[in-house]
C-alpha cells in the first residue's frame, strides 16, 4: 500500500473516498429505491383513484402522507447522486447506468414541480422513475464506479449532457401522464364522468407543460452538443446517429405540441395518445442509438442485439389501451 501511495498518489483515491465508496456499495441505495418508488407510486395512484370515486378525509390525509414520503425518496435519490459524484470525481451522468439514474431523478423532480396540486402527476412520475431504476439494475447495465472516459473529460459534460439528458425527465412525465389520462378515460362511466373529465383536463394541461419544458431543454441541449462537437471533432454537425435522432425527437415533439392547430387532430385523446407514441423517438435516441447503431455516441459493437421481450408487450399494451380509450372517449366524452 505504501508503494502504491508513493508511486500512484496522483491517481489513488483518498481514504475518505474509499470509505465513501464502501458505504455506497454497502447501502446499495438505488437498487432499494426502485422498490420503494414503485410501491409508494402504485399505492398513491390507487388512493387518488379511490378518492375520485368517493372523497374522504382519511384518504386525503393518507395521500398527503404519501406525498411527503415521495419527497423523502427524492432527497435520498439526490444524496445518492451527490455521493456517487464525490466518489467518482465527475458528474454522475457519464455512462449508461449513471444517465438512467439521472433521468429517473429528473423525472421525479419534474413530477414534484408539476404535481404540487396534482397527485396523479406525482404518483405517475414516481412509478415511472422506479421502472427506470429497475432497468438500470438489469444485468446488461454496469453499475460500477469507473474512471471518466477521456473523450468525456470536458466541461461540456456538465452542460450539454446535463441539459439534454435532463430533458428526458419532463418528456417521460408527459408520456406517463398520457398513459394515465387514457386509463382514466377508459374507466369513465356515467356516474363518474364529471370528475374524470376534470382529472383528464388537468393532466392534459400538465402534460402539455411537461412536453413544452422537455422540448425546450432538448433543443437547447442539441445546440450545446453542436458546440462540444465543434471543439472535439472540428464540426458542429455530422449526421451521427445520436445527433440525427435527437433532431428527429425535436421535430416529433414540436409536431405533437402544435397538433391542436391542425383540423382533425384536436382533442385530449389525440394529444395524450400522441405524447405516448412520441416517446418512442426518445427511446430510440437513448437506448436504440446507444445499443443498436454504431456511432460516436453509441456503445454498439456491431454484434447482434436482442430486443427485450417486454418491449413487444409494451407496444401491444399501448395499442390496446389506445383502442379501448378511443372507444370510450367517443362514447362517453362526446
Feature names for model-found ranges:
Residues 13-28, 146-161, 300-305:
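Juxtamembrane membrane-water interface segments that cap and precede transmembrane helices
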Residues 4, 8-12, 174, 191, ...:
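Residue-level signal for secondary-structure boundary elements
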Residues 187-200:
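Membrane-interface interhelical connector segments
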Residues 1-8, 138-139, 152, 156:
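Generic secondary-structure transition motif, activating predominantly at the C-termini of alpha-helices
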Residues 30-53, 63-90, 94-146, 159-186, ...:
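Hydrophobic cores of alpha-helical transmembrane segments in multi-pass integral membrane proteins
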Amino acid at each position: 500500500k505504501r508503494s502504491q501511495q508513493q508511486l500512484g498518489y496522483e491517481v489513488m483515491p483518498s481514504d475518505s473516498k474509499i470509505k465513501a465508496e464502501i458505504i455506497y456499495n454497502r447501502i446499495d441505495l438505488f437498487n432499494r429505491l426502485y422498490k420503494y418508488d414503485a410501491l409508494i407510486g402504485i399505492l398513491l395512484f390507487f388512493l387518488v383513484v379511490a378518492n375520485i370515486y368517493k372523497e374522504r378525509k382519511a384518504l386525503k390525509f393518507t395521500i398527503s402522507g404519501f406525498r411527503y414520503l415521495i419527497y423523502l425518496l427524492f432527497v435520498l435519490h439526490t444524496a445518492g447522486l451527490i455521493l456517487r459524484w464525490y466518489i467518482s470525481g465527475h458528474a454522475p451522468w457519464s455512462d449508461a447506468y449513471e444517465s438512467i439514474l439521472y433521468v429517473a431523478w429528473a423525472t421525479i423532480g419534474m413530477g414534484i414541480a408539476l404535481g404540487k396540486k396534482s397527485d396523479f402527476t406525482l404518483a405517475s412520475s414516481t412509478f415511472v422513475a422506479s421502472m427506470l431504476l429497475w432497468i438500470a439494475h438489469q444485468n446488461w447495465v454496469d453499475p460500477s464506479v469507473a474512471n471518466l472516459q477521456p473523450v468525456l473529460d470536458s466541461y461540456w459534460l456538465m452542460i450539454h449532457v446535463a441539459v439534454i439528458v435532463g430533458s428526458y425527465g419532463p418528456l417521460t412525465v408527459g408520456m406517463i401522464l398520457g398513459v394515465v389520462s387514457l386509463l382514466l378515460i377508459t374507466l369513465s362511466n356515467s356516474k363518474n364522468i364529471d370528475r374524470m373529465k376534470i382529472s383528464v383536463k388537468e393532466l392534459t394541461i400538465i402534460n402539455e407543460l411537461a412536453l413544452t419544458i422537455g422540448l425546450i431543454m432538448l433543443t437547447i441541449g442539441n445546440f450545446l452538443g453542436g458546440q462540444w462537437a465543434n471543439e472535439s471533432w472540428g464540426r458542429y454537425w455530422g449526421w451521427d446517429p445520436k445527433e440525427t435522432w435527437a433532431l428527429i425527437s425535436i421535430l416529433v415533439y414540436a409536431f405533437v405540441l402544435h397538433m391542436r392547430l391542425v383540423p382533425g387532430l384536436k382533442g385530449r385523446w389525440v394529444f395524450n395518445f400522441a405524447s405516448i407514441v412520441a416517446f418512442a423517438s426518445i427511446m430510440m435516441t437513448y437506448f436504440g442509438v446507444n445499443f443498436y447503431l454504431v456511432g460516436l455516441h453509441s456503445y454498439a459493437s456491431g454484434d447482434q442485439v436482442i430486443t427485450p421481450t417486454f418491449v413487444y408487450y409494451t407496444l401491444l399494451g399501448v395499442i390496446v389501451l389506445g383502442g379501448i380509450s378511443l372507444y370510450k372517449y367517443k362514447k362517453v366524452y362526446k
